[in-house]
Amino acid sequence: MLSKYVYGLSLGHFVVDFSQGALAALLPLLIAQHHFNYAIAATLVFAMNLVSSIIQPLFGFLSDRFRTGWIIIPALLITGLGFGTLGWDNQYFLLITSCLVCGVGIAAYHPDAAKLVNGLADVNQGHAMSVFSFGGNLGFAGGPITVTLVANALGIYGVVLFILVGGGVALLLAHYFPAMRRQSAQHWQQKRQRESDSPVPVKDDWRHFAILACVLFGRSIIFYGLNTFLVLYWMHILKQSNTSGSLALSVLFIVGATGTIIGGHLVDHISAVKTIRFAFTIMPFLLLAFSLTKSVIVVSALLLPIGMLIFIPYSAIVLLGQRYLPNQMGLASGVTLGLAISIGGIATPFLGQVADATSLITVFFILTAVALIPMGAAYFITEPTIK
């Protein structure tokens, strides 16, 4: 039976990733309030995502060197404070500062929370990591809808409620943290005992970790490409409404969240490597079919398995990263949950330039080609031996 503490950590994951998804929906209100242009408004998203992605491996490194599990509690407080003040900041400098503060909280939460989940999981590591990931995916998907409803009801100042949400979840995890730490520490102590009894020392496998990063880079570009251009594709290529396109994007996220849970069970039953290979072997063919048709019915039908397959290998990738670097698990979590994800955000402007120069259809053909990278790399990774 899965530890109840995993669900608590998943709730915290929901809170920190909620802010990333909600910021994009907050931009139109900030533009109207401060008379920003699109470029200036976009720098707010860039600032939050960049700082959270870049410094996440640093927090992972510190987690491996020191006992920093407690940092998940101030991380939630900082995230809530940063996002909750966005509606009240009256200067661009203050808005950027709030986004940076929020980004630091996001970066601080992921590595130690992922390590705790691994320690609490015992034998059901895939299921535990999928529950943890589900919380983050649900937060990312639910953020735009929730913040829009709050802003419509209370105005942009209503986002201050997020400070209370972050504080409430922080208090909940603070209450359970001593028990979580004891249970997780017991797991790692038993693991170290098994390793000390083994004549072969446990070494970090950097070569396979680098190959795994290539898998994640490809997934990140596909995810951000769909996240950025799906609504536009729905409007300009399929000739549907903006509302219809937004609904399609919501369906992608909802199906994806379900895929996260399915992926966790697959990891426990068929292994992480086979789960990754299964998803990325099929992915290029679905994206190619998506790019070749202009039928709304066919594209809508293809969207379901595409959304599922993007998220099915997510937990497997995070777990495999930790297994490849057993002596650097915090760093591994920081890279797989942070730095590697930012690659997709960096690639998105280049895809936008391609769309301007050619068409949105070309962008989806490029995403199809990109899908060949994780497909090929998946067959060069192996399942590490777990002692």
Question: Predicted regions: what is each one?
Answer:
Residues G21, N49-P57, F140-A141, F253-I261, ...:
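Residue-level signature of mid-helix packing/kink "hotspots" within the transmembrane helices
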Residues L23-A24, R207-A257:
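Extracytoplasmic gate region of multi-pass secondary transporters
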Residues I54-N90:
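Conserved MFS/SLC helix-loop-helix module at the cytosolic interface between two early adjacent transmembrane helices
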Residues I55-R67, T260-S271, A355-D356:
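Helix-to-loop junctions at the C-terminal end of transmembrane segments
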Residues S98-G135:
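Cytoplasmic helix-loop-helix junction between adjacent transmembrane helices
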Residues F132-A179:
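Helix-loop-helix hairpin linking two adjacent transmembrane segments in secondary transporters
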Residues L164-K191, M375-T382:
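C-terminal membrane-cytosol helix-exit motif in multi-pass small-molecule transporters
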Residues V267-I317:
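C-terminal transmembrane helical hairpin of 12-TM major facilitator-type secondary transporters
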